[in-house]
Amino acid sequence: MLGVQKKRSTRKTAARKTVVRKPAAKKTAAKKAPVRKVAAKKTVARKTVAKKTVAARKPVAKKATAKKAPVRKVAAKKTVARKTVAKKTVAARKPVAKRVASTKKSSVAVKAGVCMKKHKHTAACGRVAASGVKVCASAAKRKTNPNRSRTAHSWRQQLMKLVAR
């Protein structure tokens, strides 16, 4: 009896299923616009009113006026006495001595007296070269260097300087 399982007892009458009732689908009634009842109008006896006779107006003859341009009034100019201003005495400028392009001297003689840069020399500007010749510190030799290539920018800068003078 060990190998045989006990058979479970089953109901002979089928268990009734509980039927869930679906709620009846509500029909959405089309809304009717509320109809206003118009009150019956009572006929009222009108009183006869004596009509006043109105004198017919004559149309006024319009005058065609030529449009005048608005005239501006010019304010009368008052003569104002001018104050005499004392003239300031300006110191007469001395004409700058122009350098005459001298005929080429020996290069040593030229270097000894004149720096290539055209400006006022300051203490910081000058340095004494080994030979004892005073040369401007800001690469005076650069201007005379034949290997130097000029850009369009440098040309422009030079032109601007010349114009400024």
From Swiss-Prot:
Residues 1-80 are annotated as: Disordered. Residues 1-50, 59-80 have a biased composition (Basic residues). GO terms for molecular function: DNA binding; structural constituent of chromatin. Coiled coil: none annotated. InterPro entries: HC2. GO terms for biological process: chromosome condensation. Pfam families: HC2 (PF07382). Keywords: DNA-binding, Repeat. Might have a role in establishing the nucleoid structure of elementary bodies. Belongs to the histone H1/H5 family. HCT subfamily. This is Histone H1-like protein HC2.
